[in-house]
């Protein structure tokens, strides 16, 4: 389109029906042909308005339209172009909508004989981004807001008004108990591994360096039976090697639209994993439209088959509702709408805090500890789940990983450095260790699964590094942490100075104090006498100060 316009060719009827694409081969894109040229005009130079008008009739979801516009301009689009495109597309939508009144008989006849091969409604388009292992954003913020049901919003608000005060009162009680009880860390820190795009045996080799931690595997509806079988075989291997395994069940939009296919998927997975898993998380990120769940009713439809399947597989425990981020109003609503006959054995949640930077940073007065306490309070107050809380997915996205970062644009513009949420590998490791002990040792979270072992944009190991797979510093940090504290018992949080954290752990023959200083440097005095000190990756040190990166002080 850009080449056509730069050549002075103004199409004036550029809808999808007037484009022909030939398939590409071996990574080389095919040819693009524009047809039906009888309305065209030749210009010395197209105006911004004329360029925008050629975008008006494109039938493409708003999320991908943004990518197309970025690719077209290779820079920030001019304001005039965006303004004219928005106006032209609004006028064209009205023209399409008014067809019902302009051609009532033709519209009625067409509605009586729907075309099964016709275009998919934009709201039902669902595309997988294998680079970031997540669903792609197909709708922009305006369309997502427009498609949200007011009735659904009222349901959420009503549930929060009904249950929110009880959860708030329980939160106040829970917060007083932070770091007040002993916590055995054995089996509490898990790792997610990939079964689709990466060498599974190679991942197991690195996993052994971390001991025998719990492992999370995904089964995704869109993958198909061949991949489900492959994942099930990998699960068998983990089970035989002594790993506790948790399974996450991922839906797509088709799961909502084709309930029988979804039920068959659930039957296959539960049959293959019965007796081999500790927990099954039902559905995924149900408070995000891009994951195919648009309303609470959609979520209920996905859960209904589990009510009967639960009777067939009484050994399997289920967790949910698997919402993401600090959007607990949706957690409360999703729990309340859980079908009768299905009570969760744990509240599982994707508690990301990466957009705030360090885990101690506040969001509306809530740091990670406060967010975990409120999540625990919701679990305690709900009669639809057990009091156990699992963070089934968390990480920080990494700098300089481009389109592999889960928070970066799928089509970066020239000179764009990436989203400001991305962090360095050093900070990734520091934040990970701090997040783990804050959530677990506070007593509010029972288990955390790190997402994930290997991923260029967000993993402990970089599979795209020159020279082969590279263990990032975060991997070495976690390896040393688990070797030192993986089977230790948290005893107490020592009072030191503001923003200085000192958590004490008991081992069989000694104690370990893990320390760091959030947002500054602490130079002492040290809260304990120690016989040895180590940095975050296990190097012996003579500490004169401690900053963002945790250190370990051992005492006899």
PLM regions: where:
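Catalytic-loop of the protein kinase fold
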Residues: 9-16
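C-lobe/activation-segment region of protein kinase-like
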Residues: 29-97
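Glycan-recognition and catalytic regions of carbohydrate-active enzymes
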Residues: 442-447, 451-509
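Substrate-binding cleft of secreted/luminal carbohydrate-active enzymes
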Residues: 119-140, 277-278, 394, 414-459
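C-terminal beta-strand-rich structural cap/linker in extracellular carbohydrate-active enzymes
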Residues: 539-556
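Catalytic domains of carbohydrate-active enzymes, especially glycoside hydrolases
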Residues: 163-166, 182-224, 234-237, 244-246
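Carbohydrate-binding surface patches
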Residues: 495-529, 536
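Noncatalytic carbohydrate-binding groove/subsite architecture in carbohydrate-active enzymes
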Residues: 296-435, 442-444
């Amino acid at each position: 389109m850009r080449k056509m316009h730069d050549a002075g060719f103004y199409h004036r009827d550029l809808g999808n029906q007037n484009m022909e694409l030939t398939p590409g081969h071996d990574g080389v894109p095919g040819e693009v042909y524009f047809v039906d040229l009888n309305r065209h005009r030749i210009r010395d130079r197209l105006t911004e308005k004329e360029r925008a008008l050629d975008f008006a009739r494109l039938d493409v979801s708003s999320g991908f339209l943004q990518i197309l516009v970025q690719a077209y301009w290779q820079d920030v689009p001019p304001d005039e172009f965006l303004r004219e495109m928005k106006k032209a597309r609004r006028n064209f939508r009205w023209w399409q909508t008014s067809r019902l009144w302009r051609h009532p008989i033709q519209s009625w006849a067409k509605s009586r004989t729907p075309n099964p091969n016709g275009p998919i409604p934009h709201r039902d388009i669902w595309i997988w981004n294998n680079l970031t292992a997540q669903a792609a954003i197909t709708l922009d913020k305006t369309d997502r807001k427009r498609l949200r049901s007011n009735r659904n919003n009222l349901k959420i608000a009503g549930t929060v008004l009904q249950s929110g005060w009880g959860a708030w009162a329980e939160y106040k009680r829970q917060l007083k108990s932070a770091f007040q009880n002993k916590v055995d860390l054995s089996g509490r820190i898990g790792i997610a591994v990939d079964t689709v795009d990466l060498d599974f045996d190679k991942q197991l080799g690195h996993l052994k360096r971390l001991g025998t931690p719990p492992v999370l595997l995904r089964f995704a509806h869109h993958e198909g039976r061949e991949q489900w079988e492959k994942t099930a075989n990998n699960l068998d291997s983990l089970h035989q090697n002594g790993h506790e395994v948790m399974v996450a069940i991922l839906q797509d939009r088709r799961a909502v639209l084709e309930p029988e296919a979804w039920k068959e998927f659930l039957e296959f997975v539960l049959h293959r994993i019965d007796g081999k898993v500790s927990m099954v998380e039902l559905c995924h990120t149900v408070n995000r439209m891009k994951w195919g769940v648009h309303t609470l009713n959609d979520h209920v439809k996905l859960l209904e088959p589990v009510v009967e399947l639960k009777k067939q597989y009484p050994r399997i425990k289920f967790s949910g509702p698997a919402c993401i981020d600090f959007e607990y109003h949706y957690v409360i609503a999703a729990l309340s709408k859980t079908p009768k006959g299905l009570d969760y054995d744990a509240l599982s949640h994707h508690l990301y805090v990466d957009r705030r930077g360090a885990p101690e940073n506040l969001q509306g007065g809530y740091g990670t500890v406060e967010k975990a306490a409120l999540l625990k309070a919701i679990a305690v107050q709900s009669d639809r789940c057990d009091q156990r809380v699992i963070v089934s997915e968390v990480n920080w996205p990494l700098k300089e990983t481009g389109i592999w970062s889960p928070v970066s644009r799928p089509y970066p513009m020239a000179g764009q450095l990436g989203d400001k949420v991305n962090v360095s590998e050093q900070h990734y490791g520091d934040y990970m260790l701090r997040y783990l002990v804050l959530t677990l040792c506070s007593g509010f979270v029972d288990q955390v699964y790190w997402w994930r072992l290997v991923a260029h944009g967000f993993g402990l190991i970089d599979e795209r590094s020159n020279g082969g797979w590279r263990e990032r510093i975060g991997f070495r940090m976690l390896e040393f942490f688990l070797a030192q504290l993986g089977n230790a018992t948290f005893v107490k949080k020592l009072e030191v100075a503001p923003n200085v954290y000192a958590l004490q752990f008991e081992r069989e023959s000694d104690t370990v104090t893990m320390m760091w200083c959030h947002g500054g440097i602490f130079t002492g005095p040290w809260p304990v006498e120690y016989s040895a000190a180590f940095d975050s990756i296990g190097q012996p040190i003579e500490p004169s100060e401690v900053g963002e990166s945790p250190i370990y002080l051992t005492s006899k």
